[in-house]
């Protein structure tokens, strides 16, 4: 296609005269008042047309002569057309030559201007492969104190090199090394290890994308070149070297917790387990029991004597407890040591309170003349039995078990064994005759059994077994008696305090 057909004159005589390189006609038009920077429909000025025209005939002149004349008549070299190109860009693009470029630069053409595609005059000169024009441009940049860096990256579909230029920047590393990878170029891969994982296979946790995805064009690998794709590989047996977020899973934590709990349970003996559960049951409830029936006439004296009367509590429980263990069935019970220091302190304080209350109650009964009349002096054998009973199992340890059984309603088991009805205030509990004599301050029972029942020690074991297993069972409130007691229901009244006796207690 002819170059003259590409230029749109649109009836503009000045642009048409410049396009045909008619210098005399151009002078006449300018002297006649034509506007020198008038543009056509593409935004091109007469100076741009003069830089890009290639029309040659007998009356035409050269480009440099036409450009020089227009610049002398105040043509603007920095005007840009609709595509953003200036006259200098058109001169470099159409290979106008170094003479035309020098004229434009001397007239004040700007080298830093860029079109809408981001290209400058330097880029167009490089793409046109015009070395002479490029030297002129570089000289002009150096004269202004600017450093030009040119990097050729690829070729366009037409075969020309697509270039980019950078001003006021240090030179890039052109030795062919791969640039540093950006976070968007990193490909993270995670995979779970199978059970039968081979030691020869590698699991890639981190990897970089291929070079061609980053803009590279060479896919071959050179052994002498530095590594471009660092890979962290791990084998199946080397799972311990993996990160903590891969190894630690909720299931593994749960298994470790169960294993440690089983080891702790194996260290606990059955006796310690019984002691734990017995203490928990004994300390979880506060039992309210009635220990004495008192005929009160003067409530004022009773209130004043209330603090001292409380010191005789628990003594009745101790005697009833010792009746369960005759002389022939005395056994030593080993008290398991609790691991909790608080429970040990509670146990020690309970023993001390029992001893103090028992001593105070015994002294009170021995000082009462009315209560000591029917008491016979104890024998030597009774004294030995009393000494043995002191070393019997602690009442505080097993009284809790007795009181745990006490609130249970009488079931078929208690009716079958004909257990004796027990009342705390007026105790119906059988007492040994020798025990009654060896304990001063207590009245002897009305019906004395010459052969005291021997309580089976298995009852205590049965109670502990049921407590340790956590089963709910009906147990009798008193030990099993021989057959001769089936038709007897003893109801014994211990004592009753009158107002005079309460006054004596206050003054005691």
UniProtKB/Swiss-Prot annotation:
Family annotation (PANTHER family) = ANK_REP_REGION DOMAIN-CONTAINING PROTEIN, ANKYRIN REPEAT DOMAIN-CONTAINING PROTEIN 34B
Organism encoding this protein: Mus musculus
User: What highest taxon heads this organism's lineage?
Assistant: Eukaryota
Amino acid composition bias (Polar residues), ranges on this chain: 361-370
Instruction: Give the induction annotation.
Output: Up-regulated in bone marrow upon differentiation (at protein level).
Tell me which InterPro entries the record gives: AN34A/B/C, Ankyrin_rpt, Ankyrin_rpt-contain_sf
Would you tell me the protein name for this molecule? Ankyrin repeat domain-containing protein 34B
Q: In which tissues is it expressed?
A: Specifically and constitutively expressed in brain (at protein level).
Where are ANK repeat segments found?
9-38, 42-79, 83-113, 117-146
Q: Where in the cell is it found?
A: Cytoplasm; Nucleus
Q: What PROSITE patterns does the annotation carry?
A: ANK_REP_REGION, ANK_REPEAT
Q: Which residues form a coiled coil?
A: none
Q: Where is this region: Disordered?
A: 157-185, 361-380
Residue list for modification Phosphothreonine = 269
Give all Phosphoserine modified positions.
260, 293
Describe the family membership recorded for this protein in Swiss-Prot or TrEMBL: Belongs to the ANKRD34 family.
